Swiss-Prot record:
Residues 39-58, 75-104, 320-354, 377-409 are annotated as: Disordered. Residues 119-297 bind DNA. Disulfide bonds: none annotated. PROSITE patterns: TBOX_1, TBOX_2, TBOX_3. This is T-box transcription factor TBX1-A. It comes from the Eukaryota. It comes from Xenopus laevis. A motif (Nuclear localization signal) lies at residues 420-431. Binds DNA as a dimer. Interacts with dscr6/ripply3. The C-terminus acts as a transcriptional activation domain.
Amino acid sequence: MISAISSPWLTQLSHFCDVAAFTANSLSSLNATGGYHLSPSPGDPYSQHEPHYEPCSASQHSYSFGHACPEPESGASSSSCASSTPGSGSTGSSSSNKAPVKKNPKVANINVQLEMKALWDEFNQLGTEMIVTKAGRRMFPTFQVKIFGMDPMADYMLLMDFVPVDDKRYRYAFHSSSWLVAGKADPATPGRVHYHPDSPAKGAQWMKQIVSFDKLKLTNNLLDDNGHIILNSMHRYQPRFHVVYVDPRKDSEKYAEENFKTFVFEETRFTAVTAYQNHRITQLKIASNPFAKGFRDCDPEDWPRNHRPGSLPLMNAFARSRNPVSSPTQNGSDKDGDGRREYERDASGTPLHGDAAHQQLMSRVLSLSLPVPGGLVPLSTGRPSPPHELRLDPHSQGSEPLHHHPYKYPTSYDRYLGAKTRPAPYPLPTIRGHGYHHHHMNPAAANMYSGAGAPGSYEYGPR
């Protein structure tokens, strides 16, 4: 069990405190009679749904540590079931059947204050849930404390462990938004201790800053080899915070019982889950977790409405900025908006519609009555055809100089207009025969279609 604890100070700590006995005895006493019967916190949502749970105060049942971790003598600050906060003054005392051991002065006067207590209380009122994953998940709220009363020049180690609140397994009833007892607890997981990465350190260093266990991770992987805390899902747990004095004496093993002090904050108890069960817990975690900013961009009630494509800001802006392509008669009017003026400019910023060549081209493309001998000839009588259905007449193809071409890449544009369309899968009744201008000998005119003239207007023989 202790071999799973990865800490460079484990060997050193074994000379000052019997960690094996400390962990094994504290966890094995859970199944014993009169073990860890924690009193329910005020407003605890679990207490009213536990028909077989017999709450008892911390003063009636102590946190038994066996031979390694006895209780302090009466009158001293409790080292096991005490939420010792200087501001609140809530210090619990407990009694033991065996004679209490006097604590070392290095730890006897230590008090601990829980940070973010108001947030912990808010979660506790709803029934705190902590996610456990195979890879390990950090706690939120993070367990953070402020320590007082240490010897500034003494060395201390800080560690945490987690003990089951009871011997029950729970399930969440969504219809009543409450937790119910689902049966007896699963077999106990391997007991582990999490050492603060800065341990050991001088008391002055611990007291000058808030101590945060933000590296602690919870997992449900029984074969975890990363040193994470292993918990059973749908079980309730109580975190415990331990301060261990690093005794420099050679025979420090004899004083292991008096060189540590334990603090328990009942508002930090939680249920281990693989997914949040209470939606209020989910909302509170999103609202209070600084790393959940992405979930706070919009109200959860508005998510379906805000994620419709038509309601996206980009789509709205695009719809407002769209302007239909105007006819050539409107290009010079004063009603042109900014969007149209941007459309009428090429990459160099030169207005295109002001060019005579561009106006001539657009008039041929968009006019309803295109002349047959002109440059562009429609496929059939009716509305103008798209550009890919148009063909260049040989009379107008070479009449326009290259440097006056309205488009930036005239060669590519001419090939685009002169590209052959795919053959129609059915006959087109409106298409007449095609004529071939023999005297020009221009291949560009070989496939020119005309709907205005009859085949007789073109002669296949020389004149």
